[in-house]
Amino acid sequence: MRKNSIKNTRINQEVQKELSMLISRELKDPRINPMTSIVAVEVAPDLKTAKVYISVLGDELSQKNTLAGLKSAAPFLRGQLARGINLRNTPELLFVVDQSIEYGVSMSKLINEVNAGNHKASDEEESDDKGHEDEQ
């Protein structure tokens, strides 16, 4: 099975959907942040492993606690996944915190700060220009 095959893409989507449902409804671990979402899933072509990219809304401690909770719940999730999805092999789940959303938010804040600085500078230039027009 090729990495980008249609079948592999469908399996990735199905595993992501099933895990999202399981994490939100079945897990009762207090370490897992309720604002945890699965960003992407990459199931290996041999169906032995699956990298599960998660995003956790919160501070770094919350991310670490959520990751620890998910790692300890991985065998349970794998068993539930085997019941929910009919696959030849049920993949071993490897959870990875995805920083791309936080990176995007921080870049957006930086862009907004730069734009706000440009607006202030252009406002100051306009007021300076008006002052010079009054002198003429």
UniProtKB/Swiss-Prot annotation:
GO terms for biological process: maturation of SSU-rRNA. InterPro entries: KH_dom-like_a/b (IPR015946), RbfA (IPR000238), RbfA_dom_sf (IPR023799), Ribosome-bd_factorA_CS (IPR020053). PROSITE patterns: RBFA. One of its GO terms (cellular component) is cytosol. Keywords: Cytoplasm, Ribosome biogenesis. It comes from the Bacteria. Transmembrane segments: none annotated. Coiled coil: none annotated. Residues 116-136 are annotated as: Disordered. It is found in: Cytoplasm. GO terms for molecular function: ribosomal small subunit binding. PANTHER family: RIBOSOME-BINDING FACTOR A, CHLOROPLASTIC-RELATED. Monomer. Binds 30S ribosomal subunits, but not 50S ribosomal subunits or 70S ribosomes. One of several proteins that assist in the late maturation steps of the functional core of the 30S ribosomal subunit. Associates with free 30S ribosomal subunits (but not with 30S subunits that are part of 70S ribosomes or polysomes). Required for efficient processing of 16S rRNA. May interact with the 5'-terminal helix region of 16S rRNA. Belongs to the RbfA family. This is Ribosome-binding factor A. It comes from Lachnoclostridium phytofermentans (strain ATCC 700394 / DSM 18823 / ISDg) (Clostridium phytofermentans). The gene is rbfA.
